[in-house]
Curated annotation (Swiss-Prot):
Organism expressing this protein natively: Paraburkholderia phytofirmans (strain DSM 17436 / LMG 22146 / PsJN)
GO terms for cellular component: cytosol
Protein name: Uroporphyrinogen decarboxylase
Domain of life assignment: Bacteria
Gene: hemE
The reaction(s) this protein catalyses: uroporphyrinogen III + 4 H(+) = coproporphyrinogen III + 4 CO2
Amino acid sequence: MAHKLLNDTFLRALLRQPTDYTPIWLMRQAGRYLPEYNATRGRAGSFLGLAKSPAYATEVTLQPLDRYPLDAAILFSDILTVPDAMGLGLEFVTGEGPKFVRPVRTEDDVARLAVPDIDATLRYVTDAVREIRTALTDAQGRQRVPLIGFSGSPWTLACYMVEGGGSADFRTVKSMLYARPDLMHRILDVNARSVAAYLNAQIEAGAQAVMIFDTWGGALADGVYQRFSLQYIQQVVSQLKRDHGGEKVPVITFTKGGGLWLDEIAETGVDAVGLDWTVNLSKARERVGGKVALQGNIDPSVLFAPPASIRMEARAVLDSFGNHPGHVFNLGHGISQFTPPENVAELVDEVHRHSRAIRSGAHAPA
């Protein structure tokens, strides 16, 4: 599959096909733990200056690949580009994170929401996808690794849109959810249609897999999650292009704190489910029964440990999954900005080394 790809291990793993080793990429792999990223961000002048420049986005997307033999690149962007395109006025305040100038709080605010014109408002993202694909490809037309596109989930975007930024307790958005579920469903429907259009635009531009980040799904109660997050993830997935240019485009979804709902998430039509570090990978594999691939799920804090400990914990994750197709190694959440870059090299090397040993029979998982 994926002709001209020098390394298609990641895509094959997502489709539960046999691979010679377990592929690895890291959430937030292009980020502040890398000095070269910080240098580029300094030149860009701000985070938004970085994210909205296809040239800078391409530069930082490739930085971790130049350091480590990772098996996929992920578009450098931010999940809040979609509500920004809806006119909410995204700002990044130093020390406070993202803020929206015009949060969605009233019935009138909700009534004004509409699916943005992706080509007009988010062209910088699709341009970045095209530029990254070009930068990943050599003079002979051979691409190093696949490129992942992504978006936030409808619910996670709604959290930021209603709260006006990050939140410790989601009081404002949950108040709306329980007091005015009609308004919340309207927001989520607009978000779902927007996310589907956005991801399809990324696929058309050259993204070879896409991921839906449901970062705050785990903040919801059982039963509420299904109605206000999972239902809308399924709506997005049902609208996605699953083939482009004769190749399958796998879809991954990740609900942080969503281990409780693994069986239901696996029924949404996605190809792979991301797991955080609280989930037992062996039991998760048994639960989904080969229906989907699994991605994850080492604790990002392991990367603060000495190299021997990092390697031991990586082996434990690989042994837990065992010698089966359908595993993409990743962190259970995004990499910390305080991670020593040299420790990432230890992790990537051990994942490749130990998974090859498992495949060859030189090491039998417990």
